[in-house]
Swiss-Prot record:
Pfam families: AP2. This is Ethylene-responsive transcription factor RAP2-1. Residues 30-87 bind DNA. Probably acts as a transcriptional activator. Binds to the GCC-box pathogenesis-related promoter element. May be involved in the regulation of gene expression by stress factors and by components of stress signal transduction pathways. Its main location: nucleus. It comes from Arabidopsis thaliana. The keyword rRNA-binding does not apply. It is found in: Nucleus. Residues 1-10 have a biased composition (Basic and acidic residues). GO terms for biological process: ethylene-activated signaling pathway; positive regulation of DNA-templated transcription; response to cold; response to water deprivation. Expressed at low levels in flowers, leaves, and stems, and at very low levels in roots. Gene3D superfamilies: AP2/ERF domain.
Length: 153
């Protein structure tokens, strides 16, 4: 029995040490109020105050767009004291967002405004990213059914 334990500890000692990554680092979400689906889309949702229900804010291609949609919704639900992902960006849009109207705004209108901002950010990010179709030159394939001319050989 002791010999088995010694062999087990010897095997453990022979293995090279592995770097340990804390669980909270590996599973940390990039932004508040969003999550990633298995197929890669990012979704945003928020809990309504004093309710168990969640307010669906939409599905987006980028995490930034989902986070911006969340920021708009949380601002409308909780006011200027809300914890935001991008507080500087919301301050730039302050003329569009009025904290005075947040208290009685219906959930459908909050969802609509958040989805509008998220879609706008998604579109901006998609247009800013260079498209693979535009950056690669077209490939000209030769017709293999024709006999090559002497200059082509």
């Amino acid at each position: 029995m002791e010999r088995e334990q010694e062999e087990s500890t010897m095997r453990k000692r022979r293995q090279p040490p592995q770097e340990e990554v804390p669980n909270h680092v590996a599973t940390r979400k990039p932004y508040r109020g969003i999550r990633r689906r298995k197929w890669g889309k990012w979704v945003a949702e928020i809990r309504e105050p004093n309710k168990r229900s969640r307010l669906w804010l939409g599905s987006y291609t980028t995490d930034i767009a989902a986070a911006r949609a969340y920021d708009v919704a949380v601002f409308y639900l909780r006011g200027p004291s809300a914890r935001l992902n991008f507080p500087d960006l919301l301050l730039q849009e302050e003329d569009h967002l009025s904290a005075a109207t947040t208290a009685d705004m219906p959930a459908a209108l909050i969802r609509e405004k958040a989805a509008e901002v998220g879609a706008r950010v998604d579109a901006l990010l998609a247009s800013a990213a260079p498209s693979m179709a535009h950056s690669t030159p077209p490939v000209i394939k030769p017709d293999l059914n024709q006999i090559p001319e002497s200059g082509d050989i």
